[in-house]
């Protein structure tokens, strides 16, 4: 899967968890928490959605690798085909 495709799918998952987020305003290198108050429950829900969508299980110890769109794409690009 191309990085752009992956980023678009990730944005869709983020907006499913945080419906007030406008995908056009997400800055890829800025942490979700800083941009739109993503809290620990949002991160857990995001990890669950990643598992549902891509079959990728993210251990809790690696949740920091899901902190921003750029980090998510980097983390998942090798795991998602």
Could you tell me what each predicted segment is?
Residues 1-23, 76-80:
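Thiotemplate assembly-line natural product biosynthesis machinery
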Residues 17-37, 54-61, 65:
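Phosphopantetheine carrier-protein modules
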Residues 40:
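Catalytic nucleophile serine of serine hydrolases
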Residues 46:
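Short active-site alpha-helical segment characteristic of glycosyltransferases
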């Amino acid at each position: 899967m191309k990085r752009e495709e992956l980023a678009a799918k990730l944005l869709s998952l983020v907006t499913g968890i945080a419906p007030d987020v406008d995908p056009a305003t997400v800055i890829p290198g800025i942490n979700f928490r800083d941009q739109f108050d993503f809290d620990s429950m949002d991160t857990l829900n995001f990890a669950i959605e990643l598992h549902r969508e891509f079959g990728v299980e993210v251990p809790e110890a690696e949740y920091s690798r899901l902190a921003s769109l750029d980090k998510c794409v980097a983390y998942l690009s090798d795991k998602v085909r």
